[in-house]
Amino acid sequence: MITVDVDLGERAYPIHIGTGLLSQAELFAPHIRGTRAVIVTNETVAPLYAARVEAAIRSLGKTVDMVVLPDGESFKTWETLNRIFDALLASGADRKTTLVALGGGVIGDMTGFAAASYMRGVPFIQVPTTLLSQVDSSVGGKTGINHPLGKNMIGAFHQPQAVLADIDTLRTLPPRELAAGMAEVIKHGAIADADYFAWIERHIAGLNACDADLMAGAVRGSVQIKAAVVAQDERESGLRAILNFGHTFGHAIEAGLGYGEWLHGEAVGCGMAMAADLSHRLGFIDIDTRNRVTALTRAANLPVVAPDLGVARFIDLMRVDKKAEAGEIKFVLLRKLGQAFVTTVPDTDLRATLQHAVLRPPTEAPVA
């Protein structure tokens, strides 16, 4: 087992990475201080892993309740969140009750938001079961739900007590879900570590095949990068914004198509190819770097051609973004491979990227 610590002073917590973690009661024990835990999971994950986690926590002498929600991004709503609150109130959960988020990013985000809100804050543990949630969404304390006009627009910062990333759970992921997680792995290399990006390039075939050792390496590499960024900028007032590389385009794709039509990682993957293209158009990176980002995204079985939402619609959707200020869209771009920054962009270059992205992969798009 590998442990990476998120250094946030009194809110610091460990991220445990390994196999067989779901059954290890000793990993849960330090973080469930009350007498009760509530596992929040979904209809897909519950039959696979809920009994294992429940047994581990019960072995500590704790009372365990379970909330099983429908699966999918389209259920990341107020209505679904209220089902968690209803269950907590019905079970008599108090301020010492620990919530356990067992599932992917949707479950982690909603459980974390419920924990941040219930009785003004209760502890929770992240047990991510998808690659995307293990390398990204379970780390850093961002929680929330979607609004019809924008993704993750309603939420709170609420750090978990611990993260247990069990690599065994990745073996049951459908190929599309695995690919979606690879988008965030690639993102971390692109924005912060060129050597890590090159490692992903060398091992992409094995990663696509879900090789356990390579997956552990990818989770560790990504978590180390994200933990370092979060430790420096917990509330996204500066540096942490670079973790949104590809997300301004990606969130617009998700909202424009309807949440759940594309997986979050698929939209981010396409968004990274678009952001790399825009970085090149503005003269920050050379064509080879742009092509490497797009080629690796494609090699990870992610889309690199954007849906044709229309340029005006795309821009309107991107204005509903947490980075936007006074209606001005901000993008995370690459200054070079492994170094990202936040900036505004000229309208003509943005429109050029949008127009070419829906016609052909950015690697094939002529640059004006």
UniProtKB/Swiss-Prot annotation:
Binds 1 divalent metal cation per subunit. Can use either Co(2+) or Zn(2+). Signal peptide: none annotated. One of its GO terms (cellular component) is cytoplasm. It is found in: Cytoplasm. It is an enzyme of class 4 (lyase). One of its GO terms (biological process) is amino acid biosynthetic process. Zn(2+) binds at E184, H247, H264. Belongs to the sugar phosphate cyclases superfamily. Dehydroquinate synthase family. This is 3-dehydroquinate synthase. It comes from Ralstonia nicotianae (strain ATCC BAA-1114 / GMI1000).
